[in-house]
Amino acid sequence: DKGLKNPVDAFLKQNKNKSYFKRVIVKIKEVKALKKKPHNMVVKKMGMACSYPGTFCGALHAIITSKNYKSAVLKTIKAGGCNCSRANFVGAYFAAFKGIKSIPKEWIQKTEASKSFLL
């Protein structure tokens, strides 16, 4: 299974001339410009509430600054605010991008409902 090496950059390249995605592309570029900044600072700057675009921007920053599921989700939770929607997005992204095996087994084992379909 070979997917895209960098889905975020692929999205930007594929949709750069589509007006429908103009606002999304602007936000992605804003987040990419903040890649070297601490995650909690970026979340505070972009918005800690569940509303768009802050939740999208915070989740995207965790994605582009993390190498794996665990580090991205932990970073998202530690940033505070309404982190549930961000953590859901980040977890779904990494599970889809890196595969189900990217989810830490110890997390799965501690979550009763997940045992029935992930182990």
Functional labels for PLM-detected ranges:
Residues 1-80:
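Accessory "access/gating" subregions that flank catalytic or transport cores
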Residues 54, 58-119:
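Catalytic phosphate/nucleotide-handling subdomain of diverse soluble enzymes
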